[in-house]
Swiss-Prot record:
Signal peptide (UniProt feature, chain positions): none
Protein location: Secreted
Organism, as annotated: Mesocricetus auratus
Protein name in the entry: Neutrophil defensin 2
GO cellular component: extracellular region
Disulfide cysteine pairs (residue numbers): 1-29, 3-18, 8-28
Recorded coiled-coil stretches: none
Disulfide bond recorded as keyword: yes
Pfam families referenced in this protein's UniProt entry, alphabetically: Defensin_1
Length: 31
């Protein structure tokens, strides 16, 4: 899985969030 922003790539599913410093990322996993 990867932490991405602003959105997950097509073909990936968001399963949660990551926080790095004061920035939130989406936790995206490939199916």
């Amino acid at each position: 899985c990867f932490c991405k922003r602003p959105v997950c790539d097509s073909g990936e599913t968001q399963i949660g969030y990551c926080r790095l410093g004061n920035t939130f990322y989406r936790l995206c996993c490939r199916q």
